[in-house]
Structure formats: C-alpha cells, structure tokens
C-alpha cells in the first residue's frame, strides 16, 4: 500500500532512480494506492543524461508493492520493494524498458504496454 510521502523505486529506463508519492489519484479522500493504481510522484534521484529531471512531477502507475496483491484463488504475491513506472500526460510509459517483474493485475487496468515491455509477468 502506497500513501503520500512513500519513497518508491522507478522501474523503467526514463532516468529516474527514486521518486516520492505526493498524491494518490482517484478521489479526494483516497489514502492508499495498490498495484495498478495511478499516483502523482516527484522525482528525487536521477541518473545523468536521463529523460527526467530531479524535482519533476509525473503521473506513475504502481507495478510492485511490499504489501502485495491478493488473488481470487487465495494466493498473495509480495515483492521486496515498492516500484513504479513513470507515465506521460497520455498515460503512456516514458521509458522504453521495464526492469523487474510485474503482476497480471496491470493487464486489467489498461496498461498493456507495460505488461508487454516487462521481462516477467506474475
């Protein structure tokens, strides 16, 4: 579960390394975001010559959480860290590669581009 002030890893090659959640989108009093939800993030750490700059604000989709996701068959998938993929204004990924696995829940959340770029879908 992601909330405001949560530090996240950037799981694409857009140039960001770390980001911080500044808003959970989808309702005025919404507090938590899970896998597949869109949040607003501020970039905190970048690689040199990347597409994004420190301090920039972007939309991002949550692809991995330490809290995990529960499936209808009763299983639960958890990850070691919280990770996001940065999105542009058209809700398309900024990067051209995704690092690490993503879950099937992104497929139902209309993020097929991210699912197709990911090296592994759990």
Curated annotation (Swiss-Prot):
SUPFAM superfamilies: Ribosomal protein L14. The keyword Ligase does not apply. Pfam families: Ribosomal_L14. One of its GO terms (biological process) is translation. GO terms for molecular function: large ribosomal subunit rRNA binding; structural constituent of ribosome. Keywords: Ribonucleoprotein, Ribosomal protein, RNA-binding, rRNA-binding. One of its GO terms (cellular component) is cytosolic large ribosomal subunit. Transmembrane segments: none annotated. It comes from the Bacteria. Part of the 50S ribosomal subunit. Forms a cluster with proteins L3 and L19. In the 70S ribosome, L14 and L19 interact and together make contacts with the 16S rRNA in bridges B5 and B8. Belongs to the universal ribosomal protein uL14 family. Binds to 23S rRNA. Forms part of two intersubunit bridges in the 70S ribosome. PANTHER family: 50S/60S RIBOSOMAL PROTEIN L14/L23, LARGE RIBOSOMAL SUBUNIT PROTEIN UL14M. This is Large ribosomal subunit protein uL14. It comes from Vesicomyosocius okutanii subsp. Calyptogena okutanii (strain HA). The lineage of its organism: Bacteria, Pseudomonadati, Pseudomonadota, Gammaproteobacteria, Candidatus Pseudothioglobaceae. The gene is rplN.
